[in-house]
């Protein structure tokens, strides 16, 4: 299993993404699972990299399935890829994120439903199955960390899944890190599955 980081490009800027401890790059392990992550990426974003646990990687390489109870995704917002942020501009961006969190402002349910419908349709096509999922009960947990180059916000969500009529629920803790690297804005999404059939 390749334990090196991943080099990505945002516009013409090369960025080296270090590999999180205990995780490996998904792209070289399973093109199908990586494609699934691309299907779940909003149309406004671009998936740069995905990282899964070493145990999941071993399972996939041996022909098994990944549990995906913990994983990382790195994305960009496509309309901002050509913009190079100054530290001052990113400071204003952090301020707006902080303000939204302090007032518990998050995606409204209609927008969440729109995003999950898009992902459900893509996954159904990919696996030729009736797949749907929804996100409800989002609880913002506020800003979990902040530096001059990054701000992280966390939340708890209930994921409801249905595959060919078989339903299950999961409680997911998620953290989104908005990271400034070489003037480019990266979105790092970290997910951990805590409870199944919550």
State where each predicted segment sits:
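A mature extracytoplasmic/lumenal domain signature
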Residues: 19-21, 29-30, 78, 154-157, ...
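Surface-exposed amphipathic alpha-helical segments
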Residues: 183-198
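Extracellular structured ligand-interaction cores
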Residues: 12-14, 20, 69-73, 173-174, ...
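Conserved polar/disulfide-associated segments of primarily extracytoplasmic proteins
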Residues: 36-166, 171-172
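Start-of-domain marker
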Residues: 5-44
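Short, surface-exposed beta-strand/loop micro-motifs that present aromatic residues
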Residues: 170-181
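Hydrophobic h-region of N-terminal signal peptides that target proteins for export
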Residues: 1-3
């Amino acid at each position: 299993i390749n334990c090196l980081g991943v080099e990505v490009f945002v516009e013409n800027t090369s960025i080296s993404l270090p590999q999180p401890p205990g995780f490996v790059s998904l792209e070289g392990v399973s093109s199908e699972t990586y494609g699934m992550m691309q299907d779940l990426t909003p149309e406004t974003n671009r998936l740069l990299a995905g990282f899964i646990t070493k145990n999941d990687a071993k399972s996939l390489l041996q022909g098994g399935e990944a549990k995906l109870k913990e994983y990382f995704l790195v994305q960009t917002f496509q309309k901002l890829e050509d913009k190079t942020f100054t530290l001052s501009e990113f400071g204003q961006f952090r301020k707006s994120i902080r303000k939204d969190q302090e007032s518990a402002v998050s995606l409204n349910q209609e927008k969440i439903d729109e995003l999950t419908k898009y992902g459900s349709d893509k996954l159904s096509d990919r696996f030729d199955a009736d797949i749907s999922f929804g996100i409800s009960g989002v609880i913002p947990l506020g800003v979990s960390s902040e530096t001059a180059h990054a701000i992280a916000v966390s939340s708890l969500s209930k994921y409801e899944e249905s595959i060919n009529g078989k339903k299950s629920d999961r409680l997911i803790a998620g953290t989104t890190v908005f990271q400034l690297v070489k003037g480019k804005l990266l979105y790092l999404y970290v997910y951990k599955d805590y409870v199944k059939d919550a």
